[in-house]
Amino acid sequence: IISTALYAIAHATEAKAALESALLDLEGKILNQPVWALFGQKSQARIPLSVSIANPDFEEDKQLLQKISADGVRLIKLKTGFKSHQFDIMRCEYIRKYHPELSLRVDFNQGLEAEEGLSRTLDLATFEPDFIEQPVRAHDYETMAKINRQCPVLLLADESVFGPEDVKKAISQNIAGGVSIKVMKSGGIKRARKTAQIAAKAGWSCYGGDMHETGLGHLPGVHLIASCPEITLGCEFYHARYYVIEDILSTKFPIDEGHVVVPDSPGLGFSPDIEKIDALSLK
């Protein structure tokens, strides 16, 4: 079924990932095994959680920073490039001064123009984040490679790399030193695993990204990382806990002391609340 879906239509990676996730959930329940076990051993039982700081109103994000710190979260990713450069610098300064307990990552989400990409990336590199993600447009491999050569901080590719085909090209052109791996972006767990394995073999670091998902959407990514030792930089499966008003899982998405807890129950490990889905559905 998946082989047919992969080639029946170009792109549509989220739909393909949803189909594969449903089939793997079914297979796991038939075999009485969690999805991660279908791929081998569990490499991580608890995955470090990163929460993104992305509100144009930084006063609201200051409250979020206090909350997640109290919850035991120790990784944050600052979304940058959507307002002024000074706004980005101000927030970096604030986080470094008032939240030294938090490890900082930076994500431009393609927010910089090519001509400003290097200088602004280097400015934020002075705050020594763990990595800086996708400063310029996805297709601009030339500028990504230029920044990668001169940036003292790990440069991560996101929108530039969707699946195995992209990561091979990205490695050959040396556009980064790491990649954000997403089940929905890659077109499923299997293709995401392959992308991570190719990247790691080339010496790249891998991070577990997501696509603004509910708890149900997070779960395939959890099983991906649990079964994939190549993904070492944690995950960003925070929406179900910190942003979704009402999640659609029957129980809370499993987060404990700043870590996502990998489920061991059959299939994806949690079931959707059908009554909630029905109530939230458009009719």
Task: Give, region by region, the residue ranges found by the protein language model.
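Metal- or metallocofactor-binding catalytic centers and their adjacent structured scaffolds
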Residues: 1-30
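Conserved, mostly hydrophobic/aromatic
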Residues: 19, 32, 76, 107, ...
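Generic detector of well-ordered alpha-helical packing
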Residues: 21, 26, 78-80, 108, ...
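Short helix-capping/linker segments at secondary-structure and domain boundaries
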Residues: 25-34, 228-232
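N-terminal amphipathic alpha-helix/helix-capping segment at the start of soluble metabolic enzymes
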Residues: 28-29, 33-46, 260
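Metal-dependent enolase-superfamily TIM-barrel catalytic cores that perform enediolate-based chemistry
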Residues: 38-151
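Shared catalytic-loop signature of beta/alpha-barrel
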Residues: 122, 128, 139-156, 161-259
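C-terminal extensions of enzymes
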Residues: 241-283
